[in-house]
Amino acid sequence: VMVLTILISFLAGLAFRKNFRGNIIMFYLVVACLIAPSFLISLGIGLGFANLELESAWFTGGLGAHLSWTLPFGVLIMLAIFSRLNKTIEEAARDLGANEWQSLRHVVIPITLPGMIAVGLFGFTLSYDEFPRTSLVSGTDNTLPVEMVAVTGTGATPSLYAVGTMTPFFSLLVIIGSFIAIYFMQKRRSGQRISSADLYGKPGAG
């Protein structure tokens, strides 16, 4: 879910930079997923699979239910990031001979990478403890929140307390790892800026 949220949100951010036909409708559809009750979305996905005579599982209906919750946040974050991205940087890269793919790979992605990590954190956090949207469409394989609710209804066990204790530590490790990645990316970017300044600051350079 986290990887798909990052990928689709990034592509949506690129698409919304262009004034394509229907972009306003797409934007309001994204916002509608935030407004609609979680149970109704889960029920709609479940009924859709039932009408198509398909079996809903965690990698089909469950995945769609989770993405309907994580993608709106990811898309809105990427829209804010791309709105602040200076297009003259990409134009300068093209003036230096870069094509569209090289400009995307060496300019756009490095600049927006911290934002994509933030989108990934949002996607992980929202999906990790999602219950209402998953309860009706996960099939026979339950996610952790659904399984914990089911076990709690039949009586608490030591394993349930152990899982409840380890869950915050696992989430904390993911958050710390993300901050470390952002720190090293910013440090690397600062080093590249210093190297460029030294290059162009030398006498006779250029």
Labelled PLM ranges:
Residues L7-L11, L43, G61, S68-E90, ...:
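Membrane-embedded alpha-helices of multi-pass transport/permease systems
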Residues V1-V30, L47, I176-Y183:
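Transmembrane-helix boundary motif in ABC transporter permease subunits
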Residues Y128-I180, G206:
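Interhelical loop and adjacent transmembrane-helix boundary motif
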Residues V3, L67, V75-M78, N86-K87, ...:
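Transmembrane alpha-helices
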Residues V1-T5, G13, V30-L34, G62-A65, ...:
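Alpha-helical transmembrane segments of multi-pass integral membrane proteins
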Residues V1-I8, A12, R105, I109, ...:
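Hydrophobic alpha-helical transmembrane segments of multipass integral membrane proteins
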Residues F20, L79-E90, R94, E100-H106, ...:
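C-terminal transmembrane helix and the adjacent membrane-cytosol boundary/short C-terminal tail
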Residues F20-I24, P37-T70, W101, T134, ...:
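Membrane-interfacial helix termini and adjacent extracytoplasmic/periplasmic loops
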